[in-house]
Swiss-Prot record:
Enzyme class, spelled out: transferase
Catalytic reactions of this protein: L-methionyl-tRNA(fMet) + (6R)-10-formyltetrahydrofolate = N-formyl-L-methionyl-tRNA(fMet) + (6S)-5,6,7,8-tetrahydrofolate + H(+)
EC identifiers of the protein: 2.1.2.9
UniProt cross-references to Pfam families, sorted A to Z: Formyl_trans_C (PF02911), Formyl_trans_N (PF00551)
The organism's taxonomic lineage, starting at the top: Bacteria, Pseudomonadati, Campylobacterota, Epsilonproteobacteria, Campylobacterales
Entry superkingdom: Bacteria
Claim: Transferase is one of the keywords in the record: yes
Protein name as catalogued: Methionyl-tRNA formyltransferase
Known role: Attaches a formyl group to the free amino group of methionyl-tRNA(fMet). The formyl group appears to play a dual role in the initiator identity of N-formylmethionyl-tRNA by promoting its recognition by IF2 and preventing the misappropriation of this tRNA by the elongation apparatus.
Family statement: Belongs to the Fmt family.
Positions with a binding annotation for (6S)-5,6,7,8-tetrahydrofolate: S111, L112, L113, P114
Amino acid sequence: MRIVFMGTPGFAEVILRALIENQNNNIEVVGLFTQMDKPFGRKKELKAPETKTYILENHSNIPIFQPQSLKEPEVQILKGLKPDFIVVVAYGKILPKEVLKIAPCINVHASLLPKYRGASPVHEMILNDDTIYGVSAMLMDLELDSGDILGSASFLREGYLNLETLSLKLAHMGATLLLSTLKNFHSITPKPQDHASATFCKKITKADGLVGFKDAKSLFLKSLAFKTWPEIFLENNLKLLGVELVENEKSHREGEILRIDERGVLVGCLKGSVRIARLQAVGKKPLKAKDYLNGRRLKAGDILA
């Protein structure tokens, strides 16, 4: 079974690794298509996609392609690889009709479709306080995440998970689902999605990390969803790190410092309160909340803004 894999971030790398390292010798990954290396960090040094790094470090015999687009030259390259399947996981590009014709294109998407079609499904699960998390395998078509479902897997939330932890758990679940889907592909009856029930999610931007002290639970959920990037910050760009939801019922003055101790600062919201372990001013290192507030001469009763 010859497979071309299309995927870019760490979520895709977990699934690519499972494909290559599984005990079924019938699977052969014959090529990786991934996004181009991109500038990263303050120095804007080029950073390779996680999938590319994994292949270079572990399976350098597998060819890597990083095209800007999927046009006729790339289509011919794909055809030349003679795939039985094209597996797509967080690739970052919509496949044109010419690619979809080459072989069945199976997409592993980090949501229970038709819920959360688009670029940030894991963020949306967290932000919407979902109690069931899951992944879907679908047969791709020309529209965004709208293809027929080949299978899905899910689990019931037992506690709050941040983006990194939930993504990793879903990636491993997606890998198991994909291997099963490939093995049983010819006996699976694809099921059309209920398009009327579809919801969509957008690409996350820096501005999404801006928060205020209105709703404690919303602030807490954003801290989980945006932990890796863009993190959460106030209008003065003060970052809030290590946020804990204390309660979500009482009403306080917006941003009122209720208590300061070694665990952090307890801050009131219009609804609820949160404890913040560390604070980070622009261009500075993170500090214990107590140390930061002492340096600013802020005390209980003052407003954190």
